[in-house]
Amino acid sequence: LPRLCYNVRVSGTKDTGSHHISPGLPAMPEEEKPMKHFRFRTSCISLLLALAMLAASLCACAVPGEPTASQTDPSNTAVTSADASENNAETTPSCSLPELDYGGDEIVILSRYREGWTAGEIAVESILHEPVNDAVYERNKIVEDRLNIKIRSVEINCEGAVEIVEKMMTSVGGGSHEYDLVAAACYTVVDNSLTGNLRDLRKSAYLDFDKPWWSQGFNESIEYKGMQFAVTGAAVLSMYRFAFATLFNKRLFTEAKVDYLYDNVRNGTWTLDYQNSIVETFYRDNGNGLQDETGDIYGFVSNDYIGVDPYWSACNVRILERDENGDYTFDNFDAQKLQNVAEKVLQLFYGHGNASYDYKHYGNDAEQDDIRNMFAAGNAAMATLRIMALESAVMRDMKDEYGVVPMPKYDEAQKDYGTLLHDQFTVLSIPKTALDDRRDRISAVMEALCYTSYNIVRPAYYDVALRSKLVSDPDSAEMLDLLFSKVYIDAGVIYTGPLSGFHDQFRQLMGQKSNRVMSTYQKKARSTRSALQKNIVQKLQKLYDSGNA
């Protein structure tokens, strides 16, 4: 299985080949019981059988050991769910949690419920004989039994991203400890972490940050001088579902005599220039000379709001990196490179007459549904969408077959493809009202949840739902492996608020059809450096100096 964001280059690291960082965890107290390692051993042929066996194996001791997790070869696409379960059991490192018994204590998790986005990510009510739902249900039961706790999920039904953090802040401001764990949109939590409302997870006893069920990319992007206030990984499926990709309609490609995009990806020629070169090939007007949502066939459909975000990662444009001392730096930002990217994107969106269709942003990213619906209706040859669009009823009912590939590269000279996660992917944090012993208890729950998700929920979603049901061919399954192995997390994107919406400005310029990108960003450079120091570095340093996070 690909390890999403686990062994990829990320903003804030040097390209030295290995990008793991030390977990910096304190040694276990001597009075703790000896560690027992838990490994999954299953050769199931159905997910429900796997869940039953995994539930039993998690509660039993295995021989201590730390086998090295290996990356599945993306070219090996003929993988059944049974093969995946067996392979996962053989390669997953064991969990190093000691025996812990919390006497039936209740752990309260505050999270966001948005249907089609994050619903059911933290908890579900019952078994529905649906793989992902049932895997989440079984995961929570396993963790409850393993630690002798009760998980109480408090889900707030909201479309916006900020309500969860606001509710947590109200609780913290009142000095009450209502919530043990908060699961909320990344950029809102990262912004709030600078206020001192969250506990330093690196000081907790049981989080093993180096394990593959935690996102190493996120860790390396957000860690500061041994402090870290949020974490993400296999416990939350938005780490998969919010990744951007290019979808293409196989029927329209066949009719236009254009080869499917898979070989272009493999040989490195899937670039913005190539995408631009084929857009007009697919366009067919219904006869009225106008751009109609139905009736016309378009070469490309997207939008100039979050639809332009993925080009930061896809074209290897970095905002924040780290200097030789490990501090954030803006000095490597390349405004000329972004200008060049903008010219290619403007050409793709607006330079082909009526051949591209641009949905304008409205609501809480509601235009993404319009893009998906146009593509599913067979009215667009290519579309930029998040992976979660594949789960919708209209995509499942789509008459035409479709393929999935990564976002196009900047040019053929660029070595790797790059994948961006929509900045609302879920991260986990602990409110500062949790005292030290409580924080350690919550950290044990977090470690158990993420480890169990890695072995149960992730295969249910990735292998059973996504690779086996939602994509129709082994080529797309191979592309998904590649796509997820190239996720890049830039601190300049997830710190968007403190940086005064630096990456958001690109959306505005593309929406205005403006090619003044270089001059605009050169003017912003001074204020961005100031914002970096004042709004991020100085606040992090203050938290570090206080030593009481």
Regions found by a protein language model. Give the residues of each.
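Extracytoplasmic "Venus flytrap"/periplasmic binding protein-like
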Residues: 146-223
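Extracytoplasmic/periplasmic substrate-recognition and gating elements
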Residues: 395-466
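Short, polar/charged alpha-helical segment
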Residues: 118-148, 246, 251
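Short, well-ordered beta-strand elements
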Residues: 103-130, 149-154, 180-181
